[in-house]
Regions:
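Glycine-rich phosphate-binding loop signature in dinucleotide/nucleotide-binding domains
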Residues: 1, 99-102, 152-159, 220
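N-terminal helical cap/lid subdomain that shapes the substrate entry/recognition surface
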Residues: 2-92
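Conserved Lys-Pro-Asp/Glu-containing loop-to-beta segment of HAD-superfamily phosphomonoesterases
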Residues: 5, 142-172
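Conserved H-loop
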Residues: 35, 125-129, 156, 204
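A structural signal for the hydrophobic beta-strands that form the central parallel beta-sheet
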Residues: 106, 133, 162-164
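A short, structured active-site edge motif that brings together acidic residues
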Residues: 125-140
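Acidic, Mg2+-coordinating phosphoryl-transfer loop and its flanking beta/alpha structural elements
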Residues: 162-205
Length: 224
């Protein structure tokens, strides 16, 4: 296999974090006096920086946006962070990659302290100690986080591939010159139009379950 490093997103790629994230999102919305949006809209909060999602959905800016984000973070850190489930087959994938001598890094929009806590709690640190998350001010772009995950591994972007479930993962990988594998079992890329929108970019395959990722790496492309 030409890829020597696999960089994984967390939400919607390693873990189904929907229960915890949505619980904290709802807490922040209710405490600011807003009505809850539809379930479809709520699900769009999973993955991107939460302050950006509050701005997008409620039009809040400045202090109000920061207050909503603070409410979310306090609740998430103290109550909801570990309300998550590893996707079936993800540890089988990690073991197979490790057995083949392929390095693993993690790059997530989760804040750095949250990322370290949840990754270690579920045991992914058995396979990697490179866990790169967002800064406390939310200034880092996904491309910055991905680049850091590659740099810390000692690999090059040309020998690395990003695995994720959102367009932000796809764009972030492309911005640093990396290949990308899109997963459909998470929160993004649920519709054919979503997948079609990223074809012809840096995408080398579409994974419908975690073990599909290994097959894509072994053959170099997704035949579906």
């Amino acid at each position: 296999m030409r890829h020597k490093l696999i960089v994984f997103d967390v939400d919607g790629t390693l873990l189904d974090t929907s229960e915890g994230v949505l619980s904290s999102v709802k807490f922040a919305i209710k405490n600011m006096g807003y009505e809850l949006p539809s379930d479809a809209v709520l699900k769009t909060f999973i993955g991107p920086p939460v302050q950006d999602s509050f701005s997008r959905v409620f039009g809040v800016m400045g202090d109000k946006k920061n207050r909503m984000a603070d409410l979310f973070r306090i609740r998430y850190k103290n109550v909801d962070l570990l309300k998550a489930e590893p996707y079936e087959g993800i540890f089988d994938l990690f073991k197979a990659l490790t057995d083949k001598g392929i390095a693993i890094s993690i790059a997530t929009y989760k804040r750095q302290d949250y990322a370290e806590t949840i990754v270690k709690y579920f045991g992914f640190d058995k396979y990697t100690n490179i866990i790169c998350g967002a800064d406390f001010n939310g200034k880092l772009k996904k491309s910055d986080i991905i680049a850091e995950a590659v740099n810390l591994s000692g690999s090059s972007v040309g020998s690395a591939v990003m695995v994720g479930d959102t367009i932000q993962d796809n764009i972030g990988a492309g911005a640093v010159g990396m290949d990308f594998i899109a997963v459909t079992y998470g929160f993004g890329f649920k519709h054919r139009r979503d997948i079609d929108s990223i074809r012809g970019t840096n995408v080398i395959g579409i994974a419908y379950n975690p073990l599909d990722i290994l097959s894509i790496l072994e053959r170099g492309k997704n035949e579906n």
